[in-house]
Amino acid sequence: MNLVTSKPNVLLNPLFAQLGENRHVLVGFSGGLDSTVLLHLLVCLRQQLIPELNIRAIHIHHGLNPQADSWVKHCMQQCDQWKIELKVVRVNIDPRQNGIEAAARTARYQAFSANLAAKEVLLTAQHLDDQCETFLLALKRGSGPAGLSAMAAKMPFAHSQLLRPLLAFSREILENYAQAQQLQWIEDDSNQDDRFDRNFLRLNVLPILNQRWPHFAQATARSAGLCAEQEQLLDELLAENLQQLQGPDRSLSIDGLLQASMAKRAAILRRWLASLGAPMPSQSQLQRLWLEVAMARQDAEPQLMIGTRQVRRFRQHLYLLMPLAEITTNYLPWATVKAAPNSSIIPLLPEPLWLPADLGVLRFVSAGGQAVRPAAVGEEISVRFGLQGDIKIVGRHHSRQSKKVWQELGIPPWQRERIPLLYFGEQLIAAAGVFVTQAGQANENEPCWHLDWDKPLRLG
């Protein structure tokens, strides 16, 4: 292959600088112009400057184009020629919610994340024209500074980082480079279909803008960079506020938000949602979150969906919940208590019980957890869901209705039906991790069992 001469170092040197100390890279390789140039540059880096550079490529087969199989063949041949390991991943696209472009992108980056090795960084080949398109699409959506920041040249991704080393260079520069190096690449005919927003901009809008203002793409990139700076500044200024308003469970204080201006409150809410992995909410969603959830009447149990997450309120705090698996049974038999070896009356601890709906594991341990009386030999142990009736718990003199018990103990409504209830026969012994009933209380100076709930980090 041709080595890069001094002239194309305009591309090679920035790539070398951005790689830094990284020596393991995974490259998103479609076989098109942009990713072919990026992969070629990396191979040249390996030959000229970084012989220890480990390069892997990943090709995503979306199954959307009749030529997709031939593209795989092209990528395999190219990687074989350049002695690069290639991973081909087939994905399924569901365009029903956000359209085919967004669905394909989501599937692509999920595949990148799933295949990124421990020491690898991900490299993708977006260029200056792509950045301009991203900025204009954000402008069309009415985005604020976060959206108008467009794409970052370097950002956290999965357990590692995503680098976009070609972001400062136009497609024209990449095409000139590819022709000078006699590279071969594929052309996706769907790129000529201007029903897709990006293609519409690329084919019908940007040529006119660039003809009128030749440096339009560079100017939009500068604006995107300035928006990114503003977002970074806000992140730094609001980090302490966000930390002060969050509880140990990552819930957000409504009373604290009430002290902030509308603009500051919206900025804090966005950062709270982002810190928990929620998609960026629209202005309308933020308004609904505040008015319909935070400011709902006190006896209400308001909720709002943001993406697949649910925002709920409890005791003047906002909570962001992951999708919760449904509990399809209210009764789980655990064990019939057996006698320990060489004894007819000493009960043997049952094996751990795996709970449904991703609720974790219940087990009895030698120490720690909740101390409860031992079950008798022959007694049936079960786990149930859904607390009902009047309950007498340890430390209280009188029985209380189940709803009152949950309220007094500060358990949010959405968690109450997901807390395992331990029964010996028909006697409620304990709510795992929450309380022990008087019927389940261990007697002093007598052996007891210790109930331990190994639960997920977040119940919801």
From Swiss-Prot:
ATP binds at residues 30-35. InterPro entries: Lysidine-tRNA-synth_C, Rossmann-like_a/b/a_fold, TilS/TtcA_N, tRNA_Ile_lys_synt, tRNA_Ile_lys_synt_N, tRNA_Ile_lys_synt_subst-bd. GO terms for cellular component: cytoplasm. One of its GO terms (molecular function) is tRNA(Ile)-lysidine synthase activity. It is found in: Cytoplasm. It catalyses: cytidine(34) in tRNA(Ile2) + L-lysine + ATP = lysidine(34) in tRNA(Ile2) + AMP + diphosphate + H(+). Gene3D superfamilies: 1.20.59.20, HUPs. Belongs to the tRNA(Ile)-lysidine synthase family. The N-terminal region contains the highly conserved SGGXDS motif, predicted to be a P-loop motif involved in ATP binding. This is tRNA(Ile)-lysidine synthase.
